[in-house]
């Protein structure tokens, strides 16, 4: 359901846990952008 690394995205929430949407692709992040305030 969620998107893994290198998959296209437009929002952090589209990416799997501990991943952020940067430059249109999901990328791993230790902070996990999915919990952004």
UniProtKB/Swiss-Prot annotation:
MF annotations from Gene Ontology = ion channel regulator activity; toxin activity
**Any one GO CC term of the record:** extracellular region
* Cysteines engaged in disulfide bonds, as pairs: 2-16, 9-21, 15-26, 20-33
| This protein's UniProt keywords | Bromination, Disulfide bond, Gamma-carboxyglutamic acid, Ion channel impairing toxin, Neurotoxin, Secreted, Toxin
Reply yes or no: does the keyword Glycoprotein apply: no
In this UniProt entry, the residues modified to 4-carboxyglutamate are: 13-14
Query: InterPro entries per the record?
Result: Conotoxin-I_CS (IPR013141), Toxin_19 (IPR012624)
> According to its record, what is known about the domains?
The cysteine framework is XI (C-C-CC-CC-C-C).
What is the designated name of this protein? Conotoxin r11e
**Species per Swiss-Prot/TrEMBL record:** Conus radiatus
């Amino acid at each position: 359901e969620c998107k893994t690394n290198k998959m296209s995205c437009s929002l952090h929430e589209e990416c799997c846990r501990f991943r952020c949407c940067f430059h249109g692709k999901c990328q791993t992040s230790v902070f996990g952008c999915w919990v952004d305030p």
